[in-house]
Amino acid sequence: MSDTEENPLEESRESGEMEEEKEEKKEEEEEEEEGEKEKEEEEEEEKGKEEEKEEEKEEGKEEEKKEEEEEKGKKEEEEEEEEEGKGKEEEKEEEKEEEEKEEEKEKEEEEEEEGKGKEEEEEGKEEEEEEKEEEEKEEEKEEEEEEEEEKEEYNPSFEEDALQQSLTEGSLSWEESQEDGEGLEEWVEKEEQREGEEVRGEEESEVRGREEEEGWEEEKSGEEEKSEESERSKERGGEEEGQEKEEAEHEGEREEGREEEEKEKSVEREEEEEEEDTETTETKAGRAKEEKKEKQNKTALVDNIVISHEPPRSSSSLADSPEVSQIYKDNSMKVDDTEEASQKPEDILAQGKDEARLSLEERRKLFQSKGLSAEESLVSVSTEDTLFQKEEDSKVYPLSMTWSFGWNSSLPVYYMREDRRVILYTCAHTAIMYDVVRNTQYHLQGHPNIISCLCVSEDRRWIATADEGPDCLIIIWDSFTGIPVHTIFDSCPEGNGMRSIAITRDSKFLATISDSATQKVCIWKWTLAVETPACTLELPKEYGFQDNLVFNPANNKELVSNSKTQAIYYCWFEDKGILAHSAPVLTEKTFNKLVGKFSQSVFHLKLPQVLSATKEGKLVVWDIHYPSSTSSSAISAFPFIKPRKLVHLQKEAITVLMTIDSYIVTGDIKGNIKFYDHTLSVVNWYSNFKLGAIRTLSFSKTIPSLPTEKSNLPTDCTLRGDLFVVRNFIIGTFDATVYHMTVDGTKLEKLFVEPRDAVYAVSCHPYQPLIAVGSVCGMIKVWDFEKKVYLFSRTFEKGLGVQCLTYNPEGALLGAGFTEGTVYILDAMSLENESPEPFKYSKSSVSHCCFSHDSNYMATADVNFTVAVYMVVVKNGQRVWEYLARLRSHQNSIQSLLFGVHLDSNEPRLLSLGKDRFLIEYNLVKSCKDHLDVLDVHRTDQGNYPTCMIWYPPLTKELFLLICNSGYKVKLFNATTKMCRKTLLGPAYGSPIEHAQVLPVKSTLELQKRYLVFINKDKVGLQILPVDGNPHKTCAIVCHPNGVAGMALSYDGRFAFTAGGQDRSVVQWKINLGALEAAVSLGGEDLTPFYGLVSGGREGKFYRELEDYFYYSQIRSQGIDTMETRQVSEHICLSELPFVMRAIGFYPSEEKIEDMFNEIKFSEYVETGKLIDKINLPDFLKVYLNHRPPFGNTMDGIQNSFNVLGYTNSEGKKAIRREDFLNLLLTKGEHMTEEEMIDCFSTLFGLTPEGWKSEPAATCINGPEICLQKELPEEITAEIFTTEILGLTLSDSSEQLIQ
């Protein structure tokens, strides 16, 4: 054998000798420890014997006490018997004889019981001695087994396995790990001994308790055999004995507690001795090893056991960064001791028992120490697959986003992962992580406004998004988990939000440019979790609107931005807090050539230069001049840029400029993508794919592998003709199309095509999971919303923008209205024309389209207030659509167009609702070619205008039309008489309801529980029917911050869809009715939810005043001056209702008062046939809350009236002349008589103390004398009318008026 083969054996022999010496030392130490253990056990046994003797003495004392108490009881019984039997001597003698006999029996029984107890005690002692002997034998056996294990032969294979394990796990050396293992085994043995002692003590206490219970049961059985009188006496004695025994048991428990405390102290002493021993051994081993261990391994203290472990490696590339580490600094520890726990279950049991003996504070400290060591941040341990492995959130929200159709093509798309082709883009106020392979989306929700800019880190770990609008936010997300790790509030105090955002290559800093008139450049140290920027710079307006910002990849203190006319270079001096900038003016005279408008700017890969692309296909090269160390002038103290040259690259406008690896990449308006080297020489290009104008390019983070024989890479344009190697990339175009380019093989894959213009139209199929989306760009796209699969589409010719869509009840046809007035009837499955030619009878955009229930009629409405009707006729045996008639029936925009059914004839009925407050029904039977007949016209409101109309579901016997208005009210109108039957407070979420639909039901069992889905300006919400004004029956969520354009519901009622208009997206919302019902139940029953709508609640001042006015109205109705007995009831007559309303600050018009009367009078008419002429206080409160203005009386309402009726005076305010003011009161609207007007003013000015004619029993011989020419000023403004005439005050905190 060679030397190389002998070396391992020699090394193993030497190591074996070293181990034998160590084992001998260990045996000596173990023998010394065993001797100490034996001494301690002997001392404990002596203590146990002394304690047993003391217990026997105490038991004897207790028995003597019992006998004395029994004798006392007997004496008391004798005395009682003597007192009771003074007149009966014969009976006493007989009773004494019987008592003597019974006493003899009792003594005999007690002697027998004492004998039995002594025998049982002797048996128990014998059993304890036997158990001790068995335990000693077991301990001897264990010691012998340990000695045999130590004497086992040396196993070199085991040494090699342990060495490999220590190297792979990065833990201690093999010898040290063995020492730690032996220390743990010794600790386990001690813990087992402690457990055995505890178990013995518990068994002894159980035996004692059983003996006491058996004796107690025997005493009870003896008492039952005695006579009735003796039983009574014995029961009293038994109770006293029970009390004494309970006291004895308590004393026993206290003694056991003392014993446990002593055991705990002994355990603590042993642990301290062990710690001292370990410290001595560690000092012998040397402090150098300890320092290395502390650096490499972290320790977790669990029940005084030191377990070393390797800290987990963070998947982030920023784990070593001190700034980023602060984000998850406290959560990056984890004790991976699962293997030790599985190998030593006895340790865990002992640990649990030790914890049970600890005090409350000690347990709390121990729990905290374990929690800190075991916790790990999800951010620190997550991987790239974590995000899409998340389970769906529990159903805690009534509406939750499940899918987003569309893409904001004005913002870039980022390539996040190549293996699953995960891309990042934005829709409205949501950032979306889309897994192309799995066809799944993850939504990053949190912005209140439309996302205006976003960026990602070099390693694709961190995502930064910012929005524009009020309360704008900057949010940094972890792409592995979808968690927002940091949010910057109030980033733009001006409220305009951010225009551009960038992140450094090392992800430590963020830079933003605001979207305000005076732009600000801010640099943020986001990893430090601060809310203020590290540096801020205001840009002059002459620099233009900067909308592109980039960091220098080689230097995170340098930035460049550009507007269409100006490029700016920035240099950040972090220590000085200065952001220096250089913005040289560039004109056509600079190079004597046309430069063009700038598009994007980047830093050069190798040279200190900045490159700016222009819309003329040129590239401006700027040199960066750094100050020399010898320069002393203030001007040259900071770096600056100078234009060096103008390079004409191509004719087409350059829209994208970026760098990747060693290439400079451009994308242009013709769809060409070109690659240049650092000398601006062309290396390769893609121009034969006929793409749209390039909006964004994003390359994979995966570095391309070296080419092989199987590679199908293109050759570059150099003379050598090398293979062109570049990362795969994502292409986004201005026409909202996203592609994936695989360089190996030059494979272009279209990922999706979305509408590039506003989306206003959306409609769901009546019985299939299909949704049709229409865009102003002329595209109609049909999706399967359950499988999230695009099915088919049609793009119409240029100039035809889709404005509205609707399926017919059978789902076979799709009606479409276009922006230029054309109406198409399409086949629902192919989107081909159903009629030979489209209908062109309108010159303006078609806003509404609907079919009748039998699909024989279709009606449309346009923005010129015109309603058109189309019908089916039979020609040559075929059903053909023809135009019937059209009518300009409204004076303002049409809000709703609705088909219904005549209940008596089952014929369709058509209604339209306009912003002019008119509800018009058309007579389709009498209509003919070019003549649309009107059946009736009704005005729906007096001041507010209607916003939408639907059929109310048949929850009652009466058929209603539900109409929402701009005053946040929901009104129910009788479908036949058009009478307003009820006015209710609708959802108030910042803006009134604009569109509503009743949620479809899946079965007939759900017909009695219906729901309403609605949208307002920017939200989608749910409302439980019937509407009653309860604020807990409704909820809403922001769906499109820039405005909702349309809504549709799935056929099964599980999903709602909202179209975002200008944000070019449609969002799918999952409906969870259980969450809404839970909120209602938590809100309370009966009047509890309504009390919350009153200032101060039920116990507040307002409600108390309401009660006073309510009962005072009873006094008024009976006469103020009457001397008859008052009759107080729970109701007031309806005639008193207006006066109470005005008394509490609500001033309804006469029409609103009439609506209130109708609502109350006919509330039970359908069920009982009777009219109601009175109202109680709870119902009055509901009527008041539902009819009053939702936000009270405001100064804005009065000011708007003066803006319409008044003129501008010399001070620039709107005012009304006195004569005009009085004339308006007498002639316009619900005009007054002259007498009514004078009485009103006399009341307002305090000339009628009784309050005008509101007091029916008050007498007034002569009418009030008032001269309005003197009381009223010549010119009345809104402020004068409010404060001086009405006597109202304006709240300081709001514009609400206070009476």
Curated annotation (Swiss-Prot):
One of the record's GO cellular component terms: cytoplasm
WD-type repeats, residues: 484-526, 534-574, 585-624, 643-678, 681-741, 745-785, 791-828, 838-874, 881-924, 935-975, 981-1027, 1033-1071, 1109-1149, 1169-1209
Keywords: Cell projection, Cilium, Coiled coil, Cytoplasm, Cytoskeleton, Flagellum, Repeat, WD repeat
SMART domains: WD40
Region Disordered, residue ranges: 1-351
Subcellular location: Cytoplasm, Cytoskeleton, Cilium axoneme; Cell projection, Cilium, Flagellum
Family matches, as Pfam families: WD40
Family matches, as InterPro entries: EF-hand-dom_pair, Quinoprotein_ADH-like_sf, WD40/YVTN_repeat-like_dom_sf, WD40_repeat_dom_sf, WD40_rpt, WD_repeat_EMAP
Main localization, broad class: cytoplasm
Biased composition (Basic and acidic residues): 190-199, 229-257, 281-297, 331-351
Acidic residues composition-biased segments: 17-45, 91-162, 176-189, 212-228, 269-280
GO biological process assignments: flagellated sperm motility
Protein purpose: Involved in spermatozoa motility. May also regulate cilium motility through its role in the assembly of the axonemal radial spokes.
Name of the protein described by the UniProt record: Cilia- and flagella-associated protein 251
Gene: Cfap251
